[in-house]
Amino acid sequence: MHKSEAPNEPEQLRKLFIGGLSFETTDESLREHFEQWGTLTDCVVMRDPNSKRSRGFGFVTYLSTDEVDAAMTARPHKVDGRVVEPKRAVSREDSSRPGAHLTVKKIFVGGIKEDTEEDHLREYFEQYGKIEVIEIMTDRGSGKKRGFAFVTFEDHDSVDKIVIQKYHTVNNHNSQVRKALSKQEMASVSGSQRERGGSGNYGSRGGFGNDNFGGRGGNFGGNRGGGGGFGNRGYGGDGYNGDGQLWWQPSLLGWNRGYGAGQGGGYGAGQGGGYGGGGQGGGYGGNGGYDGYNGGGSGFSGSGGNFGSSGGYNDFGNYNSQSSSNFGPMKGGNYGGGRNSGPYGGGYGGGSASSSSGYGGGRRF
């Protein structure tokens, strides 16, 4: 690659995760396929460091984000006779957030002000793809905006493209954007984590903050809600709103209120709890692993050596296992596949156990 061709965009935005690879696929055959849509600066099939057997996934990095977009537009892709699943690669920082590796079509948008209307959201977000639905949440009683909205897209890639970009400005206001997860999706995450956590610890390295998620009950919801379960109510009590109803069992991390519930709780408010809050790392997007390529349990290939074992790409705990010497932060933060140059050091897996409240709730939105 000539100096004049040096990439001028962040590597993370130019990288694709390629899942579902045939075990016969090599770096060369993967490159041969994906270079049809642009110049590749890197291409690798991840392999077991001992057996050298393919793990069934890899990464390709393009020279520009336009080429990434072109490759995603060309879906579906078939490599060596097998349909594969390309997705925008998630950074280590982002992989620690709830649902980071889930395929969803809806985003949560925080920081919505009173002067922000549906047209403002549409004007900004339609650059990422076709929008199906925009919902600005309002108070049932007063009709005032509650500070957040949901945007649903036609294609999950629009969501992936949005969330890997850190900053968004809607109607001249800074907005926080995350994937919006349904009750079922959050429950599937919690269930797989509990199965791997042994005694209710959340993640591969230690417990969930100072206590298990939901106090000392061990499971989501802890002692509240009849011995566990995924929280007791939906987004802040009854549905999206509520009058101070407890969403999670109170803990040292300040998860006192639900999604936008009364008395200052919810997303980014109140004692550091909720969505992106401060405090001791609580809230959506805390410090550590929630799902996907992080946590204990079996490795990516599982004992059977199949991609995703029995649960496909979202079999949360099959992507990384430090105890199984998979592609977590091993030597120098690399994937453990023998690559020490570092292009994958900021990728999937690793970190401490998460302290995230997530969306949770008993009602689907």
Swiss-Prot record:
Domain RRM positions: 14-97, 105-184
Disulphide bridges: none
UniProt feature, compositional bias: Gly residues: 198-208, 330-365
Residue numbers spanned by region Nuclear targeting sequence: 321-359
Pfam families given in the database record: RRM_1
Compartment(s) where it occurs, according to its Swiss-Prot or TrEMBL record: Nucleus; Cytoplasm
Record keywords, A-Z: Cytoplasm, Nucleus, Repeat, Ribonucleoprotein, RNA-binding
Region ranges (Globular B domain): 95-185
Annotated Gene3D superfamilies: 3.30.70.330
InterPro entries: hnRNPA1_RRM1, Nucleotide-bd_a/b_plait_sf, RBD_domain_sf, RRM_dom
Xref: SUPFAM superfamilies: RNA-binding domain, RBD (SSF54928)
Any single biological process term in GO: mRNA splicing, via spliceosome
GO cellular component terms attached to this protein's record: catalytic step 2 spliceosome; cytoplasm
One GO MF term attached to the UniProt entry: mRNA 3'-UTR binding
Region named Globular A domain: 4-94
Function: This protein is a component of ribonucleosomes.
Protein name per its UniProtKB record: Heterogeneous nuclear ribonucleoproteins A1 homolog
Native species: Xenopus laevis
Classification lineage: Eukaryota, Metazoa, Chordata, Craniata, Vertebrata
